[in-house]
Amino acid sequence: MSSETFEFQAEISQLLSLIINTVYSNKEIFLRELISNASDALDKIRYQSLSDPTKLDTGKDLRIDIIPDKENKTLTIRDTGIGMTKADLINNLGTIARSGTKQFMEALSAGADISMIGQFGVGFYSAYLVADRVTVVSKNNDDEQYIWESAAGGTFTLTQDTEGEQLGRGTKIILHLKDEQTDYLNESRIKEVVRKHSEFISYPIYLHVLKETEKEVPDEEAEETKEEEDEEKKAKIEEVDDEEEEEKKKKKKTKTVKESKIEEEELNKTKPIWTRNPADITQEEYASFYKSLSNDWEDHLAVKHFSVEGQLEFRAILYVPKRAPFDLFETKKTKNNIKLYVRRVFITDDATDLIPEWLGFIKGVVDSEDLPLNLSRETLQQNKIMKVIKKNIVKKTLELFNEIAEDREQFDKFYSAFSKNIKLGIHEDAQNRQTLAKLLRYQSTKSGDEATSLADYVTRMPEHQKQIYYITGESIKAVAKSPFLDSLKQKNFEVLFLVDPIDEYAFTQLKEFDGKKLVDITKDFELEETEEEKAEREKEEKEYENLAKSLKNILGDKVEKVVVSHKLVGSPCAIRTGQFGWSANMERIMKAQALRDTSMSSYMSSKKTFEISPKSSIIKELKKKVEADGENDRTVKSITQLLFETSLLVSGFTIEEPASFAERIHKLVSLGLNIDEEAETTEEKATEEAAPAEATTGESAMEEVD
C-alpha cells in the first residue's frame, strides 16, 4: 500500500525537537506514559462494552503486553484497547496540538521536569526520549488497520496495514531504541520501571520474557553405539534374565539440551489498593498509586482512604497534590481527576457530578457497590446515589483539609497552592461555607508578615468590638497605608487585608463568621463609639455642615454626597462607597473584564461618598477659605478638585481625566519651586501671548491650578 506523508503541527515539531535535543536524566518515564495511554484506551473500550457487549467481539481479553526484542533492538507496548482510526492517528499523533503542548514547552524552558509531560496531555511524545523512530500499528472497530511511523523529523507517514499481523483491535507501539538506550530491553530494568510507576494500573501488564530451560532428551547416538555392543555380546550370552532386561531399559542414555520459549509474566498482580485495609498500606504504596493515577512526578501532599457502609456502600482514596495543575481553572477542559469504578469495573473519569468544581484539584478513585454497571454519562448525572457519594466526598475532603491544617508547614504549602479553591468553595457551596471559612488565612494590621485565621482574629477582638473588619485592595502595600485604617487602629480594632481578586466575592457570600458580621471598611459602615465620641461627632457634623454642602455643590454629580467623617484621623479626606454597590476594588476588577455586562456596570458602579475629616488642618483651613471667599472662588474650586482626585487614588479608584490631574499637580510643583512663568523662553511667550500674566502671590498662583 502507498504511504501518505503528513507534517507535524508546528508546536508539536518544536516539542519533539526539545525532547530529542535535550539531555534528560529520567528517560524511564516514557514507559509510564505509554502504559498510562494503553490503560486509557482499555478504559474506553470497556466503557463502550457496558452498553454494547459486541464491541468486545474483536478481543475479550483486556490487557497490556510489553515485548522486548534484543535482536532487532525494539521495545513494543501493545494493548487491546479501543484502537485508533485513521483520523485519530492523524489528529492525535501529529496535526492537532493539545492545549498543553505550548504550556509544557514553556514549563520545560523554565526548568520543569520532563516527567511532567503526562500532565499536559502529550505523554506519547516521551517515546522519543529513548527511540529514534516510532511505529504505531492501530486497529479500531470502526476502521481498517493502519501504520503510523515517524523519526520525528518534522513529518510522519500513514499506511493501511494489509500484510502485517492483524491486531483484531487495539494499538501496538514499536520503539526502535537508540543504541545507548538498549538497557530498556533487559527484563530486570523493565520490571523495575513498571513496579515504580505502573504497579497499580487496573489491567494486567504482561512482560514477554525469553526463558531458556534445560531439558533431558534421549541421546540417540549413544543408544546406537550401545546397540552394536549388545549385538556382539549376544553371541556369548545364552540367556538374559528378565530383570536385567528391565534394568537396561531404565539405563537408557540421555543428554541435556537448552530450549528457548517466550513466557508471559504478569507484573502487576497487586489487587486494587482501595479494596485493601488502610492499616496494611504503606506510604510508599499510596505514593506509587498516586503517581500512576495522576501522572505527577512528585509525591502527594495528603491522602484520605475511607469506606462508607450502610444503605450505600463505596470505597474511595482521595489525594491532595503538592501543586496546582497548570490548567486548574480552565473551564473548557474535561476534568478527569476522579476515576469512578463500579464493583472494580472502571466506568468513567468524566463524572462531573462526582465532585464540585471548586475541588477540581482533588485526584482519586471511587468504587461503588450500588451503581448499575451499564450507566451512561447522562443517567449518571440524574442518579441519586451519585449525589450521596458526592456529599460524602466533600465531607471527607473537608476532614482532610482540617487534618492538613494541624501541620503548619504542610498547610502553608496547601494554602499557597489551593487558597483560590477554598475561596471559590465559600462562594459556591452554601452548605460548607462556615467550615471552609475556618481555613482562610489573611495578613492583617496585627499579624505582621504572618497570616491569621478568622478564628484567631476573633480571640484578639477587644470586648467592645462587635464586628470583623476587612479592607480590599490591589496589594498589601496599597492597603496597609490606606487612610481607612486610621480610626480602627486608634480603637485597637484589627483589620484583615484582602488582596486576592476572589476574596471579595467570597466575603460577600460569607457575610459573617462565628456570629460576627464581616464589614468592608472601604464601604459605608457604622463604627462602634462611646457616648463621648458620639457627642463629639454630632457637634463636628453640625460645625462642618455648611462646608460639606459647598463641596457637594462644587463636585456635583461626581459624588453622591459629602459627609463629615469621624472615621478619618490623619487624612483630610477619602472616598467611601455605599453598602450595596461595588467597592473600589471590585470596580477595578470588573473594569478589567473584557466581556463584562456594561448595563450591570452602570447599575452596580460605586455611589461615591466624599468624606472630610474635621480634625485635619487642611479641612480646617478650607472651611475658613469657603467662609471668607465663598464656594465659587477659583482657589476653593481648585483645592476641592485636587483633594477629590487625590482621594480617588488613595481610596483605590482610577481618575477619569488623568491629564487634567497631572496639569494641576505640575502647576502646584511650579508654585512650590517659585517658578515665574514670565521668565519662560521667548518661544513659549509667543505661543501664549493670549494667556494672562501669572500673579506672584500664592493665592493667584493657586487660581491657575483650576
Swiss-Prot record:
A biological process term (GO) from this entry: cellular response to heat
Domain of life: Eukaryota
Binding site residues for ATP: 37, 79, 124, 377
Localization in the cell: Cytoplasm
Biased composition, class Low complexity, residue ranges: 689-700
Protein name: Heat shock protein 90
Function, in words: Molecular chaperone that promotes the maturation, structural maintenance and proper regulation of specific target proteins involved for instance in cell cycle control and signal transduction. Undergoes a functional cycle that is linked to its ATPase activity. This cycle probably induces conformational changes in the client proteins, thereby causing their activation. Interacts dynamically with various co-chaperones that modulate its substrate recognition, ATPase cycle and chaperone function.
An MF annotation (GO) of this entry: unfolded protein binding
Assembly information from the UniProt record: Homodimer.
Segments carrying motif TPR repeat-binding: 702-706
Keyword field: Allergen, ATP-binding, Chaperone, Cytoplasm, Nucleotide-binding, Stress response
Biased composition (Acidic residues): 217-231
Pfam families named among the record's database cross-references: HATPase_c_3 (PF13589), HSP90 (PF00183)
Stored InterPro entries: HATPase_C_sf, Heat_shock_protein_90_CS, HSP90_C, Hsp90_fam, Hsp90_N, Ribosomal_Su5_D2-typ_SF
Notes on the domains: The TPR repeat-binding motif mediates interaction with TPR repeat-containing proteins.
Protein's organism: Aspergillus fumigatus (strain ATCC MYA-4609 / CBS 101355 / FGSC A1100 / Af293)
Disulfide bonds: none
Span list, region Disordered: 214-261, 679-706
Entry's family note: Belongs to the heat shock protein 90 family.
GO CC list: cell septum; cytosol; fungal-type cell wall; perinuclear region of cytoplasm; plasma membrane; protein-containing complex
Transmembrane segments: none
Main localization of the protein described in the UniProt heading: cytoplasm
